[in-house]
Amino acid sequence: MGAWGIKALERDEGLDVLDILKNEYVPEHPVMDLGEMIELMKEEVMLGADFSQIDFLFDNTAMALAELYFQWKDNGKLDYDYEEAIWDKVTGFTASKEALAFLLRQLTDIKNEVPDEDGIREIVDLWKNEDSGEIAPAWLEHLNQLIDRLDSEQEARQMYIKKYWGNFIGGSDDSLNLVAFLEDQKQEEIPLS
């Protein structure tokens, strides 16, 4: 298992995520959709079918997808060197409420060390000091930042919907949920300002 940093994309399994996306997703999807990518990773058995399936690979993949999403949000591009320059073809990156919720739940389960059938959370165990049991502070901070940003994305999305749609539809929870669903169907990125 090779790793050269604290990020999920800085290990061999993260490169596997990038290779799958490069070969099977990006060529046909200039606008990347986080929900579609999650489904592709489930099909490729890089993510579990549900949260009860706990594995190092699944956890690393969830973190890698969150890292990719925020790399796009921060830079407006995905910066990976491939001869074909396939990543330059990406023009957008969308995320539905469900996709954000999926990653938030997966990463929160990691933080809370929800155990696998062997009683551990392998990805956390790998970052623990054998003597003290302390989780590597830099890795834990990175995980917490991803969780905080996913949570903020969900909140910003809800605020956008309430701000721009609340007056038109009366602001009831059912109406706002309908608007959220319709916004997800548009496949457009929701501005956060």
Q: What positions do the PLM features span?
A:
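Amphipathic protein-protein interaction modules
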Residues: M63-D125
